[in-house]
Amino acid sequence: MGPPEGIAIVSASLSPLASFGLRRGKEHQGGSCHDGRMSRVTCDLTVSLDGFVAGPNQRAEEPLGDGGELLHRWMFEDPEANAPEIEGILAAGAFIMGRNMFAGPGPSVWDKGWRGWWGDEPPYHAPVFVLTHHQHEPLEMEGGTSFHFVTDGIESALARAREAAGDRDVAIAGGAQTARQFLSAGLMDELRLHIAPMILGGGERLLDGVGDVKLEQAEVRGTGLVTHVRYLVVR
């Protein structure tokens, strides 16, 4: 079975959410309303049973490391059973990602005209704010995606993403380091873990070093290839 309509896997670095290649269909363009409240900050990540979001030996050819792509079987082999979670991933009105997710592991390739992993029409169809230490002009892509490069920290990126998202959610798209930064800083409202029944044995862990973060389990749902656990961040 192929990927669900509106979803395309991409070769993006470090975060399993990056590999989802979030592709939002036309039915999502209107957004959703949160009754006038400030948009939530969410993060969807697939992890192995031993807590890794990517396997060992991450490299340009295998940005999710050895075995990392297998984490995401649930999206592409059983999309119908996992439709609510896929819908949740697609709902964001703006995204934030780290430099490694945009450019991949290893030396920067921006000076070579790099425009991301996703071709001329990236799958986000919304503004994407890329955290970096290097100045870069915005990139306007086909299909509504635009990349904006933020050099003054996660708070600035979040403020800009909230403004762009309006009443829709802001999604932390990855990678793992970026997710940890937002979680540790108390800037995340929901952490949605998709736990794959596999052991990677090494690679990049998600939660190492996040500090004293309190989570409240809000929902658990299993579909065979994955167990979805939604946590609220308690402040």
Regions found by a protein language model. Name each.
Residues 11-15:
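Low-acidity, Ser/Thr- and Arg-rich intrinsically disordered low-complexity segments
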Residues 24, 28-235:
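Enzymes that bind and transform nitrogen-containing heteroaromatic metabolites
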Residues 1-10:
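Extreme N-terminal basic, low-complexity initiation segments
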